[in-house]
A protein has these predicted regions:
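Active-site His/acidic residue clusters
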Residues: 74-80, 157-170, 183, 188-192, ...
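Phosphate/oxyanion-binding active-site loops and adjacent basic polyanion-contact surfaces
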Residues: 85, 89, 172-180, 213
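N-terminal catalytic scaffold of extracellular/periplasmic and nuclease hydrolases
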Residues: 1-115, 120-149
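A cross-family glycoside hydrolase active-site/sugar-binding cleft signature
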Residues: 66, 106, 154, 196-198
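Formylglycine-dependent
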Residues: 99-102, 110, 148-150, 154-171
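Active-site regions of oxyanion-processing enzymes, predominantly non-cytosolic
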Residues: 134-136, 140-152, 179-200
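Well-ordered, non-transmembrane segments within structured domains
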Residues: 44-48, 52, 56-63, 70-72, ...
Length: 214
């Protein structure tokens, strides 16, 4: 029942076989870049404006980011961060908090204490910035719009702190659809909202030649 649909060509500046960072940059900004780079040009000095920034700042929309993989992985990161390398996980996490976006849900953060484990914890910083950090399904189920900005980390994490493959998911374990449904519930408002939803583990399964899990 959507009023419009769109498509994008996602080859990047140098490759017809690009990675998630450059392809997600194409989707979130409309611009090409090198593989491994998120929302910056080929010189890695000029930053691109994202669609999420535009709808938040110009239209007053609420914004939600949902994925089955880590919240600071390349695809979700391309809708709130700008980094020269997709491997800057801690920096990406900081930019997630700084975005002020309203709803994040998915797998756990990669390197939440920094690459060397000596930085202030990302989840603690998020709470200091006014986010409600949720790590149980029961608490996620109780979340309402009145709770304000929220970050939901899946309770039942699997490989690399991502959500389980749907193939392996327990009957009482939330699916991607459940996190989307909760997102719609808390983001819904008269002005409107933007939601980026990624089934990221489909990609992981294909990399592993695991047809069953796709």
């Amino acid at each position: 029942n959507f009023e419009a649909a769109g498509s994008a060509v996602t080859y990047d500046s140098t490759s017809f076989c690009p990675d998630s960072a450059s392809t997600a940059t194409s989707l979130s900004t409309g611009y090409k870049t090198y593989s491994g780079t998120i929302n910056m040009d080929e010189t890695k000095r000029i930053e691109y404006e994202t669609i999420t920034e535009q709808v938040k700042e110009q239209l007053g929309y609420k914004v939600g980011i949902i994925t089955t993989v880590n919240l600071n992985h390349a695809t979700p990161a391309a809708f709130y961060a700008k980094v020269a390398s997709r491997n800057e996980y801690y920096n990406i996490g900081l930019q997630m908090i700084e975005s002020g976006f309203d709803y994040f849900a998915g797998g756990g953060m990669l390197q939440p204490d920094g690459a060397d484990g000596n930085q202030e914890n990302i989840y603690d910083l998020a709470e200091e910035a006014g986010y409600k950090v949720i790590q149980t399904q029961a608490e996620a189920a109780r979340l309402t719009a009145e709770d304000g900005k929220a970050i939901i980390i899946g309770q039942h994490l699997a490989d690399s702190d991502a959500l389980s493959y749907d193939f392996d998911r327990a009957a009482n374990e939330w699916s991607l659809a459940d996190y989307v449904e909760k997102g719609i519930e808390v983001l819904d408002n008269e002005t409107g909202f933007f939601m980026m939803v990624e089934g990221g583990k489909i990609d992981w399964a294909c990399h592993a030649n695991d047809a069953g899990s796709t």
